[in-house]
């Protein structure tokens, strides 16, 4: 590589944006084929290619930042802005679901019986599993903050323990959510209530799984001595994402489970 007289990272040529684009094409085409022809071959192929792309792309980023020293302060600043903009885009993504929910519930149409929840629909008790889920996610927010402070203070063992605890709480939340879906007295096909409930809580659940995976990678990197007390943006990004997931759940709980029922 030629000598560069600036602190910015000139990225090497990479095949992963191309393979990622092909994976996206396969998955979107595969989704249409699955809906109409009931064949999952293409969507599964797309998913496998996407997972392989993500693993290898992120492996390259870890190599560049941890072992090659490309993540200088200006580069880290750019990554921070990128993560902030990504989380902002996610906020607007969920805003659409809340909009759909409030549009339907604040002025219920005669087809719904003029009331909310719609006539004849049994809702979930907000003070049972949903309240436990709220407590679990809030506790995980505390443990991820504990992990961050341990990391900044060089308390390696505490950082590993608190990070592992956060991941366990995330998995517990996912298991409780799966159980709740399995036992729910309504389905996604039960009108606008069922569709807004399952789409909003389902996408949140997907974000919890993504966040847990993100934190699991950080745990592995912490075990392998990748992070130092002043160079750990990978973990910081995961913590920001986890807090975002936390806050979205609080809005979901208050809006859909408590007020909406």
Swiss-Prot record:
Keyword Membrane listed? The answer is: yes
A single GO CC term for this protein reads: respiratory chain complex IV
| TM region(s), chain numbering | 16-34, 41-66, 73-105, 129-152, 156-183, 191-223, 233-256
The record's section on InterPro entries has: Cyt_c/ubiquinol_Oxase_su3, Cyt_c_oxase_su3_dom, Cyt_c_oxidase-like_su3, Cyt_c_oxidase_su3-like_sf, Cyt_c_oxidase_su3_a-hlx
Q: Which domain of life is it from?
A: Eukaryota
User: Topological domains (Mitochondrial matrix): residue ranges?
Assistant: 1-15, 67-72, 153-155, 224-232
Return the CDD domains for the record.
Cyt_c_Oxidase_III
Keyword Translocase on entry = yes
Topology feature Mitochondrial intermembrane, residues? 35-40, 106-128, 184-190, 257-261
Q: Name one GO biological process term.
A: mitochondrial electron transport, cytochrome c to oxygen
Q: Supply the enzyme class, top level.
A: translocase
Q: Which cysteines are joined by disulfide bonds?
A: none
Q: Which UniProt keywords apply?
A: Membrane, Mitochondrion, Mitochondrion inner membrane, Translocase, Transmembrane, Transmembrane helix
Q: How does it sit in the membrane?
A: Multi-pass membrane protein
What Enzyme Commission number(s) does the record list for this chain? Answer: 7.1.1.9
Give this protein's Gene Ontology molecular function annotations: cytochrome-c oxidase activity
Location of this chain's protein in the cell: Mitochondrion inner membrane
> Coiled-coil intervals in this record?
none
Reaction it catalyzes: 4 Fe(II)-[cytochrome c] + O2 + 8 H(+)(in) = 4 Fe(III)-[cytochrome c] + 2 H2O + 4 H(+)(out)
Q: How does it assemble?
A: Component of the cytochrome c oxidase (complex IV, CIV), a multisubunit enzyme composed of 14 subunits. The complex is composed of a catalytic core of 3 subunits MT-CO1, MT-CO2 and MT-CO3, encoded in the mitochondrial DNA, and 11 supernumerary subunits COX4I, COX5A, COX5B, COX6A, COX6B, COX6C, COX7A, COX7B, COX7C, COX8 and NDUFA4, which are encoded in the nuclear genome.
Q: Which family does it belong to?
A: Belongs to the cytochrome c oxidase subunit 3 family.
Function of the molecule: Component of the cytochrome c oxidase, the last enzyme in the mitochondrial electron transport chain which drives oxidative phosphorylation. The respiratory chain contains 3 multisubunit complexes succinate dehydrogenase (complex II, CII), ubiquinol-cytochrome c oxidoreductase (cytochrome b-c1 complex, complex III, CIII) and cytochrome c oxidase (complex IV, CIV), that cooperate to transfer electrons derived from NADH and succinate to molecular oxygen, creating an electrochemical gradient over the inner membrane that drives transmembrane transport and the ATP synthase.
The protein's name: Cytochrome c oxidase subunit 3
